């Protein structure tokens, strides 16, 4: 995936930008992942609910802005995922080689289980939807209800596809704006767009 480095307008801050499908008209400034699973015939998506005053009960994927050090888009996603889970899935410790090992495990978890890639043009955001393997367990007690790095109050939840759509269609919309769009809706409500439920 090609990229360029730009300087943010009015500042000296450099930002890296990737391009979706090598198209310079489809810049990516941030990226994230939505994990899905099926249990007892019902489909679920893993989301974090932010409970800060300015974003009450807003549901989001796991992701964030591209760093200058990111060589590929999955570098961004795996780093943000690790930070937002407080490294509660694969533990990060101070030894550099262990940290890299944890990051590589997250990269592999994402890359080996991709279901769909979505480019959100309005938000300049790239979303990976990945099916979580049955042997991967999210320990919510270990992950906690507070993101340590950015000091954000949040909780982690598996919610059903139906609940996702209910939150999306609510007033106000409780899904993070970077996830708004028809491609996301088509994925979570395929039957309403002429697709089978397995698509």
PLM regions with names:
Residues 61-114:
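The catalytic Nudix box helix
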Residues 54-58, 112, 121-199:
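Nudix hydrolase/Nudix homology domain
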Residues 50, 63-64, 161-163:
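Active-site donor-binding loop signature of nucleotide-sugar glycosyltransferases
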Residues 2-61, 74, 90-91:
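N-terminal strand-loop-strand
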Residues 15-24, 113-117, 143-146:
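Short, P/G- and charge-enriched loop/turn segments at secondary-structure junctions
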Residues 26-27, 39-40, 119-122, 149:
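Extracellular/periplasmic catalytic domains that process cell-envelope and extracellular macromolecules
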Residues 28-32, 63, 125-127, 153:
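Extracellular structured ligand-interaction cores
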Residues 1-2, 198:
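Universal eukaryotic N-terminal targeting presequences
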């Amino acid at each position: 995936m090609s990229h360029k480095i730009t300087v943010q307008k009015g500042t000296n801050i450099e930002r890296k930008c990737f391009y979706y499908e090598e198209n310079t008209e489809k810049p990516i400034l941030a990226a994230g992942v939505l994990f899905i699973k099926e249990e007892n015939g019902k489909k679920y998506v893993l989301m974090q609910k932010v409970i800060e005053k300015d974003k009450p009960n807003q549901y989001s994927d796991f992701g964030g802005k591209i760093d200058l050090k990111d060589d590929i888009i999955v570098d961004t996603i795996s780093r943000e995922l690790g930070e937002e889970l407080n490294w509660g899935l694969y533990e990060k410790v101070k030894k550099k080689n262990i940290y890299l090992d944890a990051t590589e495990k997250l990269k592999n978890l994402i890359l080996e289980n991709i279901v769909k890639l979505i480019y959100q043009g309005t938000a300049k955001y790239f979303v990976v939807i990945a099916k979580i393997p049955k042997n991967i367990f999210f320990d919510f007690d270990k992950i906690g209800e507070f993101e340590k790095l950015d000091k954000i109050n949040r909780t982690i939840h598996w919610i059903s596809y139906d609940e996702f759509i209910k939150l999306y269609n609510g007033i106000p919309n409780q899904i993070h704006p970077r996830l708004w769009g028809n491609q996301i809706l088509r994925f979570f409500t395929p039957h309403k767009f002429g697709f089978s439920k397995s698509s």
